[in-house]
A protein has these predicted regions:
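A structural signal for multi-pass alpha-helical bundles of membrane permease subunits
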Residues: 1-270, 275-276
Length: 276
């Protein structure tokens, strides 16, 4: 039982690491590309073509993507990178490091993070673009008239107004990240063992529910892990939503206080005959 609890905590840690490691570069890259593609000052040749190409990985099945990267970067001697590495006289490189104690988590996790980022940044980019295009163009025109540079327009106009879309992306990505299963489960050369660095909570649930020996099936552990995963998702979702709402409320209160202060100042000047 203690082993099961340890495995669940390790799986939860792996899930968080894999999600954070692919969400941060994904959102940054998506924001950068969305700003570029929606900037009227930039004339990028073949803009529509690049949008389609960047979105394409999102429609490829996870099985196909995992098979592709196993052929490119894996422990298999037939993989492209290991083949080149061994042709230079080196021993086969352990990209997967399937056991925790081997200490090579960085490679396997890094590859899965890259795959997840590559698969999903196109979808996130489209959502960021839709959010930017939904902003009133007159705000950008006013900022340009006031002499704001590109960085100031981004930080003072685009990002604040894009925050609802970023929060929505964060919540949906967090839900998907906590349910991450396909790529971590499929990316391993040894078909008889799961990479311990990549065992997520969803894989933990599957392993305890689906075993070769039906006598050792642990439906209770699978059910409990599923409920815990659901509760964690709900709590984190509510936390992010409340944080965003509280930030909006704090901003509105600050604006109201400023208006009240200005009103009182004007009233005081009026009483003193200071209004011209």
């Amino acid at each position: 039982m203690r082993k099961i609890h340890t495995q669940f905590l390790e799986a939860l840690g792996n899930t968080v690491i894999l999600w954070v490691g692919n969400f941060i570069p994904q959102i940054l890259l998506s924001l950068l590309l969305a700003v570029w593609f929606t900037d009227s000052k930039l004339h990028i040749p073949g803009k529509g073509f690049f949008k389609v190409v960047m979105y394409l990985p999102n429609i490829i099945t996870a099985v196909s993507v995992a098979a592709l990267f196993l052929r490119l970067i894996s422990n298999q001697t037939s993989s492209a990178v290991n083949g080149i590495w061994m042709s230079w006289g080196h021993e086969k490189f352990d990209f997967e490091g399937a056991k925790i104690y081997e200490g090579t988590a960085g490679w396997s996790r890094g590859i899965v993070m890259f795959i997840q980022t590559w698969m999903w940044f196109g979808n996130t980019m489209i959502m960021m673009m839709s959010g930017i295009l939904g902003i009133n163009p007159s705000l950008f025109e006013a900022a340009n008239i006031d002499g704001a540079n590109s960085r100031q327009v981004l930080t003072k106009v685009t990002l604040p107004l894009l925050r609802p879309m970023v929060v929505y992306t964060l919540i949906t990505s967090m839900i998907g990240g906590l349910q991450m299963f396909d790529i971590p489960y499929l990316y391993h050369s040894d078909k008889n063992a799961i990479n311990e660095h990549l065992r997520t909570v969803a894989i933990f649930v599957y392993e305890n529910f689906h075993v070769a020996d039906m006598k050792n099936v642990r439906y209770g552990y699978s059910g409990a892990a599923s409920v815990l995963l659901f509760l964690i998702t709900v709590v984190l979702g509510i936390f992010v939503f409340r944080m965003n709402r509280d930030a909006d409320e704090a901003r509105k209160k600050k604006e109201r206080r400023a208006l009240v202060k200005e009103y009182k100042k004007q009233q005081k000047l009026a009483k003193q005959g200071g209004i011209v």
